[in-house]
Amino acid sequence: MMDSSPEKTNLELLYERVCEQGREFEVVFYPMLPRLYEMMLPSLEARLNFLSVGYRHVAFARYVHGDVDCVHREVMAQKMVLLTSILSKLLNVNGILEHQEYLNTE
């Protein structure tokens, strides 16, 4: 049995309780992108290109306007962080699926 010290997070404590039960759970991946992105950017390559163009526009805006601290820049930075994390998760999931397909080819 694992130690339940107060230094552990709630997630770690929950994981310990689930593991102690000895049950297996099915993992389901739900779509994380808004429906608009799926229609506008149907492929993973299109989403990566969209992100790349966004970074170029930010670089251009910084070059033209300098380091301006405004709400627009903050919103753009937050959206880019969100899209980056979503795309990295998509890449990880695709890598897992490709690896699993490779394992099931025998």
From Swiss-Prot:
InterPro entries, sorted: Herpes_TT2 (IPR005208)
Superkingdom as given in the UniProt entry: Viruses
Keyword tRNA-binding: no
GO biological process, one term: viral DNA genome packaging
Primary location: host cell
An annotated GO cellular component: host cell nucleus
Keywords: Host nucleus, Viral genome packaging, Viral release from host cell
Keyword Metal-binding applies: no
Pfam families listed in its UniProt record: Herpes_UL33
Protein location: Host nucleus
Subunit annotation: Associates with TRM1 and TRM3 to form the tripartite terminase complex.
Stated role: Component of the molecular motor that translocates viral genomic DNA in empty capsid during DNA packaging. Forms a tripartite terminase complex together with TRM1 and TRM3 in the host cytoplasm. Once the complex reaches the host nucleus, it interacts with the capsid portal vertex. This portal forms a ring in which genomic DNA is translocated into the capsid.
HAMAP family: HSV_TRM2
The family this protein is said to belong to: Belongs to the herpesviridae TRM2 protein family.
Official protein name in the record: Tripartite terminase subunit 2
Species annotation: Human herpesvirus 6A (strain Uganda-1102) (HHV-6 variant A)
Lineage: Viruses, Duplodnaviria, Heunggongvirae, Peploviricota, Herviviricetes
